[in-house]
């Protein structure tokens, strides 16, 4: 990669990071001017890299999904299928409860913007399919390694876990202590089920 391309990638990354912070603070109505000022670039640089505000919003959503997936996959990398599935639940719950700017933006884009913006809806559907498939595969892996009962319908369990995690994502308005109680109850139920 050339020095110029590397600099462009770095600028693009800095813009996305600044947009995440700005959208978390001001909502999706945050101005291009404010984001450009946060990064120390011109508004024209934002248009150069993303084409439009909608293009920047799409890239922020994709980056939020990449970060979430990376953290959850890393947390659930080792162990039996059962251990990995439970680690995925724990990691997701911790990340959702963190209320970091990144997760506030992920929630906002996932729950509202994706329903209003067709390009974001396509990204959301792809992410949901990938997430569901990953959870179903963890259940099947657990069935193969003997850590999850083979009598269980792997698809039903994976879909249930996915639905619960989606539910936890939407509970951001609840106090953190309440969120932790709900996650603990779900995790206990899941342990008993598996």
Where on the chain are the PLM-derived regions?
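Alpha-helical elements of Rossmann-like donor-binding domains used by nucleotide-donor carbohydrate transfer enzymes
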Residues: 14, 18, 34, 55, ...
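Hydrophobic alpha-helical connector segments
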Residues: 59, 73-104, 154-161, 183
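Short, intrinsically disordered or compositionally biased N-terminal tails of bacterial proteins
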Residues: 1-3
């Amino acid at each position: 990669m050339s020095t110029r391309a590397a600099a462009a990638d770095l600028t693009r990354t800095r813009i996305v990071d600044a947009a995440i912070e700005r959208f978390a603070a001001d909502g999706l109505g945050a101005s291009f001017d404010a984001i450009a000022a946060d990064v120390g670039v011109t508004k024209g640089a934002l248009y150069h890299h993303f084409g439009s505000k909608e293009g920047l919003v799409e890239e922020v959503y994709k980056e939020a999904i990449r970060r979430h997936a990376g953290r959850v996959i890393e947390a659930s990398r080792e162990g039996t299928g059962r251990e990995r599935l439970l680690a995925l639940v724990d990691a997701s719950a911790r990340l959702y409860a963190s209320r970091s700017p990144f997760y506030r933006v992920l929630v906002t884009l996932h729950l509202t913007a994706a329903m209003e913006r067709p390009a974001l809806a396509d990204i959301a559907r792809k992410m949901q399919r990938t997430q569901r498939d990953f959870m179903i595969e963890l259940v099947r892996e657990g069935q193969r390694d003997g850590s999850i009962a083979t009598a269980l319908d792997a698809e039903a369990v994976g879909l249930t876990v996915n639905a619960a995690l989606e539910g936890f994502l939407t509970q951001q308005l609840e106090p953190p202590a309440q969120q932790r109680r709900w996650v603990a109850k779900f995790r206990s139920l899941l342990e008993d089920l598996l």
